[in-house]
């Protein structure tokens, strides 16, 4: 139950952070490009690398806190952070083909499903 509470609290904070950070970035740079989303994805990718690497090497971060920060906060902030971390680990392990497939399939599948969602929404 403690882990679920960590996820819920940090998830709410991640969602609010995404809202405010992306909004601030959009105010600075406009909406011609998805700068806000791009910014939170970069922040999330950096944070998951930092949190995972630090927490797996140190006893200072409990497993519950690590889960709260990664699944909760970063999950609320962005899902791209997990994608980045997993792809980096594949590359680090010498799995270039799998890492490349992960990038290609993830991006293409998300684009296709975005397109499908738009089609369904337009049909309603």
From Swiss-Prot:
Transmembrane segments: 4-24, 32-52, 67-87, 101-121
Residues that hold Na(+) according to the record: 75, 78
UniProt GO BP: cellular detoxification of fluoride
PANTHER family: FLUORIDE EXPORT PROTEIN 1-RELATED (PTHR28259:SF1)
Keyword Transmembrane helix: yes
Lineage: Bacteria, Pseudomonadati, Thermodesulfobacteriota, Desulfuromonadia, Geobacterales
This protein's GO CC annotations: plasma membrane
Source organism of this protein record: Geotalea uraniireducens (strain Rf4)
Regulation of activity: Na(+) is not transported, but it plays an essential structural role and its presence is essential for fluoride channel function.
Record keywords: Cell inner membrane, Cell membrane, Ion channel, Ion transport, Membrane, Metal-binding, Sodium, Transmembrane, Transmembrane helix, Transport
Protein name (record): Fluoride-specific ion channel FluC
Catalyzed reactions: fluoride(in) = fluoride(out)
Pfam families attached to this UniProt entry: CRCB (PF02537)
Cysteines engaged in disulfide bonds, as pairs: none
Gene that encodes it: fluC
Physiological role: Fluoride-specific ion channel. Important for reducing fluoride concentration in the cell, thus reducing its toxicity.
Entry membrane topology: Multi-pass membrane protein
Subcellular location(s) per record: Cell inner membrane
Family recorded in the similarity comment: Belongs to the fluoride channel Fluc/FEX (TC 1.A.43) family.
């Amino acid at each position: 139950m403690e882990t679920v509470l960590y996820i819920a609290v940090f998830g709410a904070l991640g969602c609010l952070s995404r809202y405010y950070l992306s909004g601030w970035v959009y105010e600075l740079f406009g909406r011609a490009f998805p700068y806000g989303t791009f910014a939170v994805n970069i922040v999330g990718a950096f944070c998951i690398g930092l949190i995972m690497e630090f927490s797996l090497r140190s006893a200072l971060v409990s497993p519950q806190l690590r889960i709260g920060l990664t699944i909760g906060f970063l999950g609320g902030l962005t899902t791209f952070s997990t994608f980045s971390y997993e792809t980096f680990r594949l590359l680090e392990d010498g799995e270039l083909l799998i890492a490349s497939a992960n990038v290609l399939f993830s991006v293409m599948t998300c684009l296709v499903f975005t397109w499908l969602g738009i089609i369904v929404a337009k049909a309603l």
